[in-house]
Amino acid sequence: RAEGLPHGVVLADAGYGDLDAAKAVLEERKPKSLAMTFPGGTHDLWLRYWLKAMGIDPVDAGIEIKPVPPPDMFNNLNQENVRGYSVGEPWNARAVVKGKGFTAITSQDIWANHPEKALVTSTGFADEDPETLEKVMLAIFEAQQWLDDPANVPETAKIIGVPKYVNATPEEIESRLAGAYDLGGGHGEKDFGDLRMRFFRDGEVCFPAPSYLLWAMAQYVRFGYLTELPDTALADELILSDLYASVAATAGVTVPDTGMAPLEIALDDTTFDPTDPQQEASRP
């Protein structure tokens, strides 16, 4: 999935995907605040990981990282309440369309085909009404496969590009959903091709791999949200692997055997070993 980290045009000298240039600009211009959607959420992790990869500690650099609801991101950038933000589409595209921002890097540049959203329920619901939960999961499987077809991108943009859903224009949504990015800031265009935002990818996208959870917990330690790693058994407690496998079989969806495979993070050329998350948690 490709999501942008846009910044106001005042930081456009940072270029696209250039960590050295971005670091130089951030250190010179000293932005006081950057935004993400929710503390500990994926967009928070992408932003903090990007800064870490440049050797920038937001506290030492005097950068406040603050939560802003996704639909309010552009207005906060436009009003200079923040100088940049990490959020899902189409709010990155809006900054480009309005000429107020550019895409500095996308989450696909950080970690290709990374995990994102999850279906989360209470233990009570999962235990007391498994039939309804299974129906919801089957519906999601069906929707994911439909959304993954490039031919359905225009219709998807029209369906969700209305006030009661995303409240953005279909034009803002469609190009990024298709993986065709105008980066803004005079940085040209980029076509992500097969690395565009995906929803199924033969069952790979929807697979709740324990390694993903362990990677996130390691980042929580790196970024100061946790003082130490929880027991790794927590992954098995939180992920209902047996239920997923059962519903996937009903839907004819392949369950990958990569749940504990190493993860390759492109941005800083690291490999995460899920059997030893402490190694990642201890990394500067």
Language model regions located:
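A bilobed periplasmic-binding-protein/Venus flytrap-type ligand-binding module shared by bacterial periplasmic
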Residues: 1-2, 115-131, 146
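Short, glycine-/small- and polar/acidic-enriched structural segments
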Residues: 1-66, 76-93, 100-113, 264-277, ...
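Ligand-binding pocket segment of bilobal, Venus flytrap-like solute-binding proteins
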Residues: 63, 67-103, 122, 158-165, ...
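A polyampholytic, Gly/Pro-enriched intrinsically disordered region
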Residues: 83-88, 125-130, 135
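Secondary-structure end/capping motifs
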Residues: 128-239
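Conserved C-terminal helix/tail region of periplasmic/extracytoplasmic solute-binding proteins
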Residues: 214-284
